[in-house]
Amino acid sequence: MACLRIWRNRKRSALRMAHHCCDVSPARHNACMNTFTDAIQFAQSYEVPWPRDPHAAPLPGQVPFGVHHGDPAPWNVLRGPVHMRGGVSGVVLQRGVEVAAWGAPDRADQTFSVAKTYLALLAGVANARGLLPDVDEPVVARVPGIGFDSAHNQSITWAHLLEQTSEWEGTCFGLPDTVDRYRTVSHDPRPPAGVKGDARPLQTPGTYWEYNDVRINQLSLALLHLFRQPLPEVFLHTILQPLGGGEGFRWEGYDDAWTEIVDASGTKRRVQSVPGGTHWGGGVSISARDQARIAEWMRSGGRHRDEQVVSTQWLARMAEPCAIAPFYGWLTWLNRDGRNFPGASTQASFMIGAGGHYVWIEPAHEAVVVVRWLDSAHAPGFIERIAAALSKH
C-alpha cells in the first residue's frame, strides 16, 4: 500500500487522552481555556506564510509551500504527494488532561520533520522486541545489501543515524546525500559552514553533525528491513491505535520509493519505504490531538497497559544531548542551555517540522504542547506565552 488510511469511530479506553479540560463543569473548562487565550491568539495571528493549497502560487507576503524549492536542481521538485493544509491549530495537555485546544485539532495534516522523532520511536520498538539490541552495532551487521556495505559506510551505527552524525554517503531512492550537505535549519545554533548542496568533504562517522534528510530516509529504509514490515503498519498498530488515535493518519512515500522485503512469514512483499519528513513530499499526516497523545505517552514512560512498548531507558536516551551537538538528542531537539527555546525548561524536548510544526514535551509542568502551521519566526513568543500560562495552571 502507498499509505495507511484509518477511518473509524474512536473507542473510549483508559488510555485515551481526555478531550475536556478537567471533566468538570463548563465554567471550569472555560477558565482553563482563558488561561491560554493570550498564547492561542498570538499563534493564530502568525500563521506560516505558505499557501494552504500546496500547488497554488504564493500570494503577496507568502512564500512557496514546502522546503524543496531551496534545493539545487534537479532535486528541487516533489517526489511524493502533498495535500491541502489547515490553519493554525494546537492542543495542550497537562498531567494527561486536555486543558486547551484551538483551530482544527482533529484535522490530519502533513507534519514534515516531526516524523523523524517517530522513526526514533520505531527504533525503540525494535529495541524492545530484541530486533535492535545494540545501537552501537554497525547497521550493516543486521541489514546488509541496502547501502551500508562500502568502506566508508560500514562503520555507521544505529546511534550515528539517530543523532544525525552518520556521514552516510550514497543515493537513497534517487536522492544523493550531497543535496543536504551544508544544510542549515532554524534551530541549529551554528553558523552556515558552506553552500547547501556542495560536496562537503566527509568526516569519520560519529564525528560531524549535520541535519540531512537523505540520511534519515536511509535510516527509515534500514528500519523497514529490520522489521520486515511496512513502518506505517508498525507505528499505527503498536503506538498510535492503542492510544485511541489513528483517524486520518497516513505515512506516504515517494512515488518511486518501492523495495522488496521478505516478511516474517517468508513471503516476498513489494512495499514502500517512507521518508522521515515531507522535504520532497509524502511523510506523515496526523492530527494535533494524535501528536499530543504520542507526546504524552512518551512523557509518561512509553507503556500501553501492561506492555512496555518502548523502554524508559530508550526514551531517556532520546533526550540526552549529542556529544558534538548538545542541542540535539536522538532525532529530537533539546534546550539544555536554555537558549535554543527561551521560556521552555532546560529539560524540555521538541519535535519540529518545517511549516511551523512544534510538539513540545515539558517535564517542568507535566505538559505537552502541540502547535501546527505557526510562523517559526514567532515560535519564541508562543513558547514564552504558553510557559507563562502553564505556570499559572
Regions found by a protein language model. Give the residues of each.
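N-terminal leader/targeting segments and the immediately adjacent pre-domain N-terminus
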Residues: A2-P105, F112, A128-P133, E163, ...
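Active-site Gly/Thr loop motif
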Residues: T259-T278, A319-V369
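Catalytic-site signature segments of enzymes, centered on catalytic residues
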Residues: V97-G103, T111, C172-D256, G282
